[in-house]
């Protein structure tokens, strides 16, 4: 295995671990109908490079193992993250990516809450959408600041 492949595996492992651990640490606000999963900020990495998508998806899967929603969140939540990341990679713009993340998570997690807890779909999809958009728009501004650091972008993110 060459050095670049090892670096990619390690980078994805670190991203996945960070996402999972930090989400579990903020679990009171990271799960449920009204959620502010602050770790979602890092899914915006997918706007810059598809190489981060496996780590982000696995991190979400690991975090959802601790979810009170159980198997529903493991399946639906992880699928939402994967679909959102793919959409973000396609648009390559952090602000459009924030909207994509909000819509995808709102719809899929809203459906999850409807199926698992029989909560009203539309209002819960809206709550998840709003929480996700707040977090991701803050993240988009943070990433716009990071874009000014050419060394960071060229060496670690865009490479």
Regions found by a protein language model. Give the residues of each.
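Membrane-embedded alpha-helical hairpins and interfacial helices in multi-pass inner-membrane proteins
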Residues: 28-33, 41, 68-159
């Amino acid at each position: 295995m060459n050095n670049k492949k090892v670096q990619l595996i390690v980078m994805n492992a670190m991203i996945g671990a960070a996402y999972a651990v930090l989400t579990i640490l903020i679990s009171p606000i990271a799960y449920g109908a009204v959620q502010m999963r602050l770790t979602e900020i890092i899914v915006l990495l997918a706007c810059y490079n598809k190489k981060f998508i496996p780590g982000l998806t696995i991190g979400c899967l690991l975090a959802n193992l601790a979810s009170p929603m159980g198997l529903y969140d493991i399946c639906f939540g992880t699928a939402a993250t994967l679909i959102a990341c793919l959409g973000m990679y396609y648009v390559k713009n952090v602000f459009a990516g924030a909207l994509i993340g909000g819509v995808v998570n709102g719809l899929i997690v809203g459906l999850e809450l409807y199926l698992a807890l029989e909560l009203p779909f539309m209002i819960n999809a809206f709550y998840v959408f709003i929480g996700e958009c707040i977090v991701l728009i803050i993240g988009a501004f943070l990433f716009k600041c990071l874009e000014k650091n050419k060394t960071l972008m060229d060496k670690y993110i865009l490479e």
